Swiss-Prot record:
One Gene Ontology term, aspect cellular component: mitochondrion
Name listed for the protein in its UniProt record: GTP-binding protein 8
Binding site for GTP: 118-125, 147-151, 165-168, 227-230, 262-264
Residues at which Mg(2+) binds: 125, 149
Cofactor: Mg(2+)
HAMAP family: GTPase_EngB
Record's keyword terms, sorted: GTP-binding, Magnesium, Metal-binding, Nucleotide-binding
A Pfam family hit: MMR_HSR1
Family: Belongs to the TRAFAC class TrmE-Era-EngA-EngB-Septin-like GTPase superfamily. EngB GTPase family.
């Protein structure tokens, strides 16, 4: 039934895509959504709905319902509409705004804000680049040199929202956090959602736990993104997803119960994440 609906919608969108030619503002660095819609059904499901794809491989007695928390399950039309929020055009300027080392240096903005946090090397820059792949002029700045000051980088996404790339936390995390990340998370008034990146190959580390505890302590609404899902076999990924899902279900209060598995290499899950961000920031009105 769901598959039929999916195919009905896909067929409809394909008609729309072919009627209008290439989608406006879509650049070649990411598979434009119209191209994704032309993929065979199995591949399309893997790219657009990675959790659904994983669910296919659940054996019936393996803790039913554990990854069935699909609270956010938009149609292909909705995902297609959200793409335009992330496509840079003259009327929808997507640009780097500024960097800050302290919250009082951060731009004062009214529009909703989302931030991305995660330990160094988790794949944060790669994900942000993937989100901005239809805004080729945006440079995602990376400052990885040891001793180089790490900053919060602010990006404006049209009139919709700002996206903040927070410094990655490493073994020197506590200092960075107290000075910057913690204050930002605690005091940023327009912060709508925090996206916490966890490496799906590694699982939740001690450093991730510090960030989770912080989000919990400040009662922030946050969302867990599982990165690099292209790196593991389906079996290993499923095991990791089930473990992390169980952790979220039993150990957290503020974490959105649905995980977002993504790959910045295959773009799997990236379109769905864009749609979620567009939705929670009210960009789809
Ligand atoms: P950051 O330190 O969190 O910003 O991490 P980066 O985005 O720089 O990524 C760290 C390393 O992981 C780089 O070598 C990336 O090429 C690699 N990487 C990032 N995302 C992915 C992914 O989705 N799949 C794979 N296979 N590698 C990734």
């Amino acid at each position: 039934m769901a598959a039929t609906r999916l195919w009905h919608r896909t067929g409809r969108l394909l008609e729309i895509a072919s009627a209008f030619g290439p989608w406006p503002g879509v650049y070649s660095t990411s598979p434009a959504f119209a191209e994704v819609l032309r993929m065979p059904q199995k591949q399309l499901r893997k790219v657009v709905y990675p959790l659904r794809e994983l669910e296919q491989h659940l054996v019936t007695d393996s803790r039913p319902g554990l990854i069935e928390q699909r609270l956010f399950d938009p149609s292909l039309e909705d995902i297609g509409r959200a793409e335009s929020v992330f496509a840079a055009t003259v009327r929808n300027r997507i640009e780097y705004l500024s960097s800050a080392v302290r919250l009082d240096h951060a731009p004062s903005l009214r529009q909703p804000e989302v931030c991305f946090i995660g330990r160094s090397n988790v794949g944060k820059s790669s994900l942000i680049k993937a989100l901005f792949s239809m805004a080729p002029d945006v440079e995602v700045r990376i400052s990885k040199k040891p001793g180089h000051t790490k900053k919060m980088n602010f990006f404006k996404v049209g009139k919709h929202f700002t996206l903040v790339d927070m410094p990655g936390y490493g073994y020197r995390a506590p200092e960075d956090f107290v000075d910057m990340v913690e204050t930002y998370l605690k005091e940023r008034n327009n912060l709508k959602r925090t996206f916490l990146l966890v490496d799906s190959v590694v699982g939740i580390t001690k450093l991730d736990n510090i960030a989770i505890e912080m989000c919990e302590e400040f009662a922030l609404p946050y969302v867990m993104i599982l990165t690099k899902i292209d790196k593991s076999s389906k079996g290993y990924l499923l095991k990791q997803v089930l473990q992390i899902q169980e952790f979220v279900n039993t150990q957290t209060q503020g974490c959105f119960p649905q995980l977002f598995p993504i790959s910045a290499v295959t773009y799997s899950g990236v379109h769905l994440l864009k749609c979620f961000i567009a939705d929670i920031t009210g960009s789809l009105k």
